[in-house]
C-alpha cells in the first residue's frame, strides 16, 4: 500500500487481524449526493432527469387558464453564480444561495379559429423569470443561512405503500386481535381498513368517520354478486323434493363434525352423525365415485345465497345475493322450480363470513348511492349534486394532482400484493383497493403475517434534497393558483411571463424551511466529530414524522434490521432516545431512500471480493456470516458450522448455505462509536455515553493524537473538512501561517487552467459553539504532495488525525476522598503546560439605528467616560485589535439621542453658541459582559449604502484588498515562471530570424543568450520556424489573458467590498467585535474518557504532592478505581495498558535516537514493532530520512489502532508491554512483572503505597461544560413584570429560586425571620426592597417586610373569577 504524506510522518500500528475489504465511503456522501441530485446544477438543462427542482417544475407546469386559451409552459431552469462566497456570507450575515431563473413560454391561442382538439397559436412569448433563491450546500455539507452554519437532518419516516397490522389485543377487553390495513400515499388521503370486535369490516378516509367497506367496493363499481364472488367460493346445492344434494369437495369436509349420516351414492354410511370427517373418509367417498352428498333440509337453513336467483319465466328475483335461506324462501324456490342453489362457503376456522355480514349492514343500493355516502362523510352538510359527488370521489384516489403514491409507494405496494413488476400508476386503481381488502380478509382468516412497522424495509429516509423539493413544490403550487387566476388577463393585456409570476411564495416557503423547520438545525460545531455526526444524523421527529410524546418503546428500540444500517449505540440520552439515530459507518441510501449496507458475496463456501449492497427487505432472504468468520488462505470458510444471520435470527449454518458475509466488524456502528477503542469490552450504556461525550470535546490549544485509537481517526478528520487537503498534487512553493501555495504537477494541470493552487488557512474563526477554528500548516517548502494529502491541521486534529483530547498518565487509586463519586484529581503540571487550555471566541454586536429622536452615532465622543477608557478606542470609537479587555470595558462607543426637554430661550441661545451636545445624548456603548474577559482579535464594520464610511471601516477594506492582491500576485508569479520555463524549452536550440540585442538572422538561440535578455523581451525574438513562432504567440496571449482575468477578479472584489452592506431595516451601521478568551482547566470543569467515564475536576494538586513512580515520574490524573467495576466499561483499563506500552516504546525509540543508533538498527526495531502482531506495514517504502523523521515523531508515544470488534487481544497488549519495558525498565520504574501496575510513592510523605497501582496512558477529553459558563452570582438585577420576583437563569442575570422544599427546610428549623426575609424583601415585596436599600445606606441592618407582590397577583386573579375579596388589617 502507498502511504500518504502524513502517514509517512507517523504510521499508526494496527492490531486488526482482517485487512480492509472495502474503503470507508466518504462520510458526507448522503447529504452531498442528495442535494446535488436536487439542484442538478452541473447537468445540461436538456439532460436533466425528473427529480429535484426539475420534477417540481414539471409537476407545476404547464399552467392553463380557466377558459383554456392561454397556457404557460416551462422549458428549463438555470442557477446563477452566488453573489458572495461562503466566508463573505458568514461575516455579512447573508444566506449562501443561488438565484433560480426559469425559462417559460406563454402561449396565447386564437379564440375564433381554435377548436377544443386543435388550438391555433396566436402569439408566443418567451422569458426567463426569477423563481426565488435556493440555498447552496457548502463543500462540507452544511448551509449558510443568515450568516450561521446550519445542517438539514435527514428524516426517517414511514414509507409510502400499504401496511397490515393488528392492535395486539389492546382495544377489546377479550384480547381479540383486530386486524387493519392502511394505504399511505406520499401525498394525498390515507385510506384505512379495519375490523371491529364483531368482525364487521370498515374503511375510513383520513381518519374520519368509519363506514362499511362494502360502500367503498360498491363505489368502485362492484355489485352484491361480484363482491361475494371476489371473496368467497361457492357450495353448490341441488334442491330435491325433500332435502337437497351438496356438491362433494373433499378439503371442505375434512375436519368437520358431521351433523348427519354421510353416505356414498350406494347409500352406505361412510361417516356416522356426530363423528369427525377424516382424510380416510374423504378418500373412501372419492373412490366410490361420489360427486354429491345428500343433506337434510335444516342443513340449508342460515346459508347465504351467492348470487341473485331469478325466475326464468317471469324474470322476478326470487332470492337476492347475500340473502339468508329460511324455510319460507326454500319453499318459494321449490315452487318456482329452482334446482341449482349456489351458496357461499364459510366456516368458523379459516373462511369467515365477514364481507357477507358487512354487506348486510350496508344500506346503499348502487354505485352512485355509495359515492353519495362517501361524499356526505367527507363534506358533511353540503348538498351532494351528481357532479360534485363524482368529482370528489375521483379526486380522492384517482387524480394525479391530489394523490401521489410515489415510486417507492408503488414498488412497496406491488411487492406486498405479490406482483412481479415494481412500477405502475402513481394513483390507486380499483384492483389495488380490492387486493388490499382481500389480503386483510385473508389475515383475519389466519393466512399471512402482519407487517412490522419498525422494520427498516418499512421506514425510509427523506434527505435534504427531497425535503427541499417538497418545499419548492409547495411554493410553486401557490404560484400556480395565482398564475391561473391572472392568465385570463394575458389575452386582453400585453402581459409578459414575469408580470404573471410572483416568486415570493417560493422564497417564503424555502426561507421558512431552511430557517425555522424542526429538521433545519444550528450546526453542532464543537469539534470535527460533532460536525460529521450531525450531518449523518437520522431523525424520526419533524413534520410528517413522530412526536416525542406519542413515540412508544417499540419505535425507539434497537431492531434487527438496524444491523449495518443504523448505529445501535449512538443516540441521545433523554426524551429523544431511540428517535434520533446515526447512520452506520458503511451504510448508504438506495434510489428509493431505504438504507443499504454492503456484504461480500459467498459462492460455494468461498468468500469473493464482489460486494453487494442489500436493503433490509433483501437481507431477510439470505444467510449472512459475520465479518469475524474464519477463512483459510484461499478465502474459504472453515469449520462445519458457522455463526450467521437469517431473517433476523442468529443461526449456525454449514459453509455451503452461507450466501453473504459482513465486510467489516465495525460495520454495525457509527463514526462516533467506531472511535472508541476496545468498544467490545464496554457496557452498551457506557459506550453510548462515550460516543456522545466525544462530540462535546472542546478543541484544545495543542491537539495531541490519541496513542490508542481505532484507525478511523484519519478518515474522520479528512471527511469532516476541518483539515485542508490538496485538490491537486504538486510541489509546495510557499508556506506561512496564513496560506500555502502549491505549484501543480504538469500532468494534473488542465489546459487553460492556472497551474497554481493557493490555500488560505482559517485563523481564529468563531464556531457556532464559540470554540476556535484554527488551521496550522504541516508542510514545508519543497515538499511533494499527492492529491488528497493533508496540507494543514485544523481544530482537534494532529497530523491529519482526529485528536479530541490529551494523553494523560492515569493512576487508578483513591486520594484523600478527592476522587469520590467520579471526581477527578489533576496535577498542576497539566494546567501549567497548557495541556487542556482552550480558546473560545465570543462575538459582540452593536448597531446604530435611526430612531424617532434622530440617528444613533458610533463615535469616540462619549459623555462621562474617563480618558483611560477612551485610550483604547480609535478615532471612530471602535476598540483596537489586540486590546485586552475586562468586564465593563467599552468596546464600541455609541450615543443615542435623548428626548428633548423643553428649554428656555436663554438655554437654547447658550446651546447654539457653545454647541454643548453631551447633555442631549445618552451613552449606549457596547461593553464587555460581566464574567467575560479576553483579547480583541477582529473587528468588522458594516455600513448601509449611502452612508459615509469611517476611517476604521475603510482600513478594514484596504487590508482585505491587500490580502487578495497578494494572492493574485503569487498566482501570477508562478504562472509566469511556468510560462517562461516552457518558452525556454521551446526556444533553446532553435534558429532565430532576429530579436533583442541585435540578434543576427540565422543565429541559434542558447541559454546564455536568453539569460542576458530580460524575460519580458523574449516575446520579441522572431523564430525562423512558423510553428515555434505560433507557440510563442500562444503563450504570450495566454499570459496576457491570465493577467486580464486577475485584474477583473480584483475589480470584482473591490466592488463587493466597497458597495453598501445589506443591514436589517432601520440599521445604519453595525460593528462586530470578536473576543478571544483563554480558558484554563479549573475545578468544576467536566472531563471524560472515551468509555463513558465522566467526572468533574475536584482539585488541582501541586505536582510535588501527586503520587509518583520509582523513577520520579508523577501521575497526571488520579481516578477512582470504583468507577470501573460497577460501570462495566473495562475498555478503559485495556486502553490504559496499551497506552502505557505505547509510551514505553516511544521512549525506547527516543533513547535510540539520542544514542544516534544506526538507521538499520532503527528499521529492525520498527519492523519488530509494526510487523510482530496485527496488520503488516511496508516500511521498505520509506527512505532513511523518512524513517528518522518518523522515529522522531514516535518518541512521544507510538500511535496504536485497535479497531472495534477486531482489536488487540490480551496477548497483543502483553507483547507490546514486553517490547516497551525490558527487565531493566521494570526495576527502574518499579513495575510488577506483568508490567501493568507500578509501585507508587506518596508525593507528600515520600512513603510507598502498600499495593501496586494500575497506571498507564488514557486519551482524556475536556468537555464543553465549563465552570466559567455555568458560574453565576446576582446581587440585584431585573425583576419579572407581573410578579415582581427576580428572573431566573444566567442569561437573564437571574437569582436562585428559594422553592417549596427550601421553605420547608427553614420551617423545620423554625427560622421564621430568615424565612420572612426570603419571601418578602429578597423576593417580591417592592416597598420592602426600597426600604432595605435605604437602611443599608444609613448603616442600619433592619428590615420592614410588607406585602409580597405575588399575593396581590393572587388577589387580582381571584377577583377576575368574580369573587369579591377584601383585605382587612389584623
Curated annotation (Swiss-Prot):
Its EC number is 2.7.7.6. The keyword Transcription applies. It catalyses: RNA(n) + a ribonucleoside 5'-triphosphate = RNA(n+1) + diphosphate. Keywords: DNA-directed RNA polymerase, Nucleotidyltransferase, Transcription, Transferase. GO terms for biological process: DNA-templated transcription. InterPro entries: DNA-dir_RNA_pol_bsu_ext_1_sf (IPR042107), DNA-dir_RNA_pol_bsu_external_1 (IPR019462), DNA-dir_RNA_pol_su2 (IPR015712), DNA-dir_RNAP_su2_dom (IPR007120), DNA-dir_RNAP_su2_hyb_sf (IPR037033), RNA_pol_bsu_bac (IPR010243), RNA_pol_bsu_CS (IPR007121), RNA_pol_bsu_protrusion (IPR007644). Gene3D superfamilies: 2.40.50.100, 2.40.50.150, 3.90.1100.10, 6.10.140.1670, DNA-directed RNA polymerase, beta subunit, external 1 domain, DNA-directed RNA polymerase, subunit 2, domain 6, RNA polymerase alpha subunit dimerisation domain, RNA polymerase Rpb2, domain 2. SUPFAM superfamilies: beta and beta-prime subunits of DNA dependent RNA-polymerase. Pfam families: RNA_pol_Rpb2_1 (PF04563), RNA_pol_Rpb2_2 (PF04561), RNA_pol_Rpb2_3 (PF04565), RNA_pol_Rpb2_45 (PF10385), RNA_pol_Rpb2_6 (PF00562), RNA_pol_Rpb2_7 (PF04560). GO terms for molecular function: DNA binding; DNA-directed RNA polymerase activity; ribonucleoside binding. GO terms for cellular component: DNA-directed RNA polymerase complex. PANTHER family: DNA-DIRECTED RNA POLYMERASE I SUBUNIT 2. DNA-dependent RNA polymerase catalyzes the transcription of DNA into RNA using the four ribonucleoside triphosphates as substrates. Belongs to the RNA polymerase beta chain family. The RNAP catalytic core consists of 2 alpha, 1 beta, 1 beta' and 1 omega subunit. When a sigma factor is associated with the core the holoenzyme is formed, which can initiate transcription. This is DNA-directed RNA polymerase subunit beta. It comes from Albidiferax ferrireducens (strain ATCC BAA-621 / DSM 15236 / T118). The gene is rpoB.
